[in-house]
């Protein structure tokens, strides 16, 4: 089992955790339906960039 030789400093701990922050998702509003969706994804109604791409 691996055991550390020395206690990691607060600085090293902070540097390791610097990439752990969560970011908010970027959402867009569809031109045709006004529905919000993730960028580069279709809406739940099947619209993408103002056009109907999936017929339901």
Swiss-Prot record:
Residues 1-34 are annotated as: Disordered. GO terms for cellular component: large ribosomal subunit. GO terms for biological process: translation. Pfam families: Ribosomal_L32p (PF01783). It comes from the Bacteria. Belongs to the bacterial ribosomal protein bL32 family. This is Large ribosomal subunit protein bL32. It comes from Sodalis glossinidius (strain morsitans).
């Amino acid at each position: 089992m691996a055991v550390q030789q020395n206690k990691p400093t607060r600085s090293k701990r902070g540097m390791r955790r610097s990439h752990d922050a969560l970011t908010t998702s970027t959402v867009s509003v569809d031109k045709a339906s006004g529905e919000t969706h993730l960028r580069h994804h279709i809406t739940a109604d099947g619209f993408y960039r103002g056009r109907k791409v999936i017929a339901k």
